[in-house]
């Protein structure tokens, strides 16, 4: 009688195990990712149009940064993050603004957007770090150059420097912020640069771009996270630098077999390069002999998809998912931009999809959505939020990604900067005497 009871119980247990859904036996690990371009605070395009009048360009940008007060924007961004609770956040345009009193003084950090955002989050998030490396890759920068980038801000500079003016510059970078609870789950971290760069002023001012990455254990499964910001400036009848940089990114990631998530502002819409007669208020790349309309080799987004990366969505071809279009002062889209956006099917004024989360190697998207597309705006981009499930739970740890470093400033670049500064100084002296 007892033997029969034991046998029945054993058969029942085996049957239960066989017919219980796998998901009920061991749930697959899940995590949430956010992509957010937090905006350096000024319209670089307008500033570039003011060059070679460097002081005017610098003052223009500084004034806009003050108007777009990040101490207020960081609170709004932090509230958004607290609402959605992403495990990992890919930040672009994580900006530091530096100023210096004179040519011989050290530069002083005046604004640090990443630190301000983390402070607004109350310590719940940190930058991924391991073995002395932090997931922050400095990219495009303009150093504070006396005479060239002098700006006037008496209220601020009197407290810091005891004078009304200072030479100011900035550095924008990519960063990976993670929940503090994941800080001890970081396996390794790296930062690297793209070989393709863009020179605004030949030999003097070069825009470097790159990416930062971290391998993090998500419920004991190692996942590789990458965040990047590809180049926005492009030249007619040339392959855009964004496409060249995407090609290198794909090459760098080709040996990664572990679950992979790539986050960022790719400065590439699926419609690029566009026919000359197509609506293009965002001034995205247009078709040419070198880059015919829709040519994959000239489109970072298409290159990623062709390389086997999955777009987490929402559907990038749907106008309601566009992420770029607010004006420089974050009051909304300009009237012409709004009209064009509404004609495309986006009621809020966004005209281009530039921000994405891509996955590969057994990372499956569960849900995705566009965030931050309604006023008030904390940045000039809408963001992307997605929840994922890890299907590839058996992959081994992949080797670290290759390291590429930017070329250091050369002797002739320093000579050029010195000569340009001298010329502007002499012009200013003559104007003062006149």
Model-derived segments and their meaning:
Residues 400-416:
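Juxtamembrane/start-of-transmembrane alpha-helix segments at the extracytoplasmic/lumenal side
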Residues 135-223, 227, 365:
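A well-ordered secondary-structure block
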Residues 8-21:
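Bacterial N-terminal signal peptides
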Residues 25-157, 391-399:
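N-terminal, active-site-proximal structural segment of metallo-dependent hydrolase catalytic domains
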Residues 187-188, 237, 251-261, 268-394:
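Metal-dependent phosphoester-hydrolase catalytic domains
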Residues 420-434:
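C-terminal membrane-anchoring or membrane-association module
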